Amino acid sequence: MKNKNVQYLDNIKNSVNDLLDFYTDNHRKTLSIRFDVRYPQNYTGDTSSKNISDCMAHMVKKYKRRKCDPYYIWVREQNKSDHPHYHCLFLLDGTRVKTYNHVFKSVETIWNSTLDIDRDSKGLIDYCTNKSNRDYNGKMV
């Protein structure tokens, strides 16, 4: 019998694979963008999953207007910190968009707005990039 953590991770992996299979089956090109979303260190507001759901709903609305057929999945993680953080995968129609840096700027602005903090606050979105490999994120499939 598998332990609960392994079963949980298998469920997440299967959900991600199902989403990727669905999206790539329905689009000639898929742009996948990975990022992590955090709360400010001294944040005293609500830290429920409603915040990330609202943020991603705004992201979807923005990219639907651009006809990029956005889809996403996120996973909440909370280790020893007071606040959870989220691992996110955002998918866009690769025939409609070629680059991904605008996604980081958008999610930064929308997350700050969701938390009702300064729009220009930085450091809450981890771009999941690798300095030695500029093509580490924003994979086109």
Name each model feature, range by range:
Residues 1-31, 94-141:
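Catalytic "initiation/cleavage/transfer" segments centered on a nucleophilic residue
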Residues 18-79:
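Signature for HUH/AEP ssDNA processing cores
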Residues 33, 72, 86, 113-115:
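A broad, low-specificity signal marking well-ordered, structured residues that form hydrophobic/aromatic
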Residues 45-47, 84, 98:
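Short acidic, gly/pro-rich beta-turn/loop elements at beta-sheet edges
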Residues 51, 88-90, 102-106:
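Generic preference for flexible, low-structure residues
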Residues 72-94:
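Histidine-centered divalent-metal-coordination microenvironment in nucleic-acid enzymes
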